[in-house]
From Swiss-Prot:
It comes from the Eukaryota. Belongs to the DAP10 family. It comes from Macaca mulatta (Rhesus macaque). The modification Phosphotyrosine is found at residue 72. Homodimer; Disulfide-linked. Heterohexamer composed of four subunits of HCST/DAP10 and two subunits of KLRK1. Interacts (via transmembrane domain) with KLRK1 (via transmembrane domain); the interaction is required for KLRK1 NK cell surface and induces NK cell-mediated cytotoxicity. Interacts with PIK3R1 and GRB2. Interacts with CLEC5A. Forms an CLEC5A/TYROBP/HCST trimolecular complex depending almost solely on TYROBP. Interacts with CD300H. The chain crosses the membrane at residues 35-55. Keywords: Disulfide bond, Glycoprotein, Membrane, Phosphoprotein, Signal, Transmembrane, Transmembrane helix. GO terms for biological process: positive regulation of phosphatidylinositol 3-kinase/protein kinase B signal transduction; regulation of immune response. This is Hematopoietic cell signal transducer. One of its GO terms (molecular function) is phosphatidylinositol 3-kinase binding. Its main location: membrane.
Length: 79
């Protein structure tokens, strides 16, 4: 189900976009095609590396086997 606030945001988005003047970015330059292709390629390489690192760090690890064969003094039933 869509939250009513999200619908209101989507309806007001064109109004906000219409109020911005075109070319209002001072000091912004256009990106050359090789630079844009390099950014996309770097993102394509970095994203799977980040996902893989998060997967390796977040996966459940096997806990080492508890030493049930140990003899416990002062613990009845364990020895």
């Amino acid at each position: 189900m869509i939250h009513p606030g999200h619908i209101l945001f989507l309806l007001l988005l064109p109004v906000a976009a219409a109020q911005t003047t075109p070319g209002s970015c001072s000091g912004c330059g256009s990106l050359s095609l090789p630079l844009l292709a390099g950014l996309v390629a770097a993102d394509a390489v970095a994203s799977p590396l980040i996902v893989g690192a998060v997967f390796l760090c977040a996966r459940p690890r096997r806990s080492p086997a508890q030493g049930d064969g140990k003899v416990y003094i002062n613990m009845p039933g364990r020895g």
